């Protein structure tokens, strides 16, 4: 089965919801088209990012969202920041050839 490396930007409520959704994907899509591997989560500070990584099951945390966009192993950039911060991140992710997911509330 194909695996997809996920980088999630933002670590608030929607990040938690998306993280739970990645974990539950095989329960809703059977057979699942692939498995999400939660690689990196970004938040405003290193401390917050590392805490979010531990709480939400990501391998690592970073305070720089560009670390996710620039990582050649990341397949999907999931944007869970406030809406007014989506554009710059989405454009950078698209230019890097990433698949883009986002939370819109």
Regions found by a protein language model. Give the residues of each.
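Beta-loop-alpha module in the N-terminal Rossmann-like domain of NAD(P)-dependent dehydrogenases
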Residues: 44-47, 56-102
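N-terminal Rossmann-like dinucleotide-binding module
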Residues: 1-56
């Amino acid at each position: 089965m194909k695996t997809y490396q996920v980088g999630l930007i933002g670590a608030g409520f929607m990040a938690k919801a998306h993280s739970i959704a990645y974990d539950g994907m095989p329960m809703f899509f059977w057979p699942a088209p692939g498995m999400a591997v939660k690689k990196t989560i970004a938040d405003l500070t290193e401390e917050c990012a590392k805490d979010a990584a531990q709480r939400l099951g990501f391998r690592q945390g970073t305070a720089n969202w560009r670390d996710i966009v620039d990582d050649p192993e990341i397949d999907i950039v999931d944007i869970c920041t406030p809406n007014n911060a989506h554009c710059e991140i989405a454009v950078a992710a698209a230019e890097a050839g990433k698949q883009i997911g986002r939370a819109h509330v």
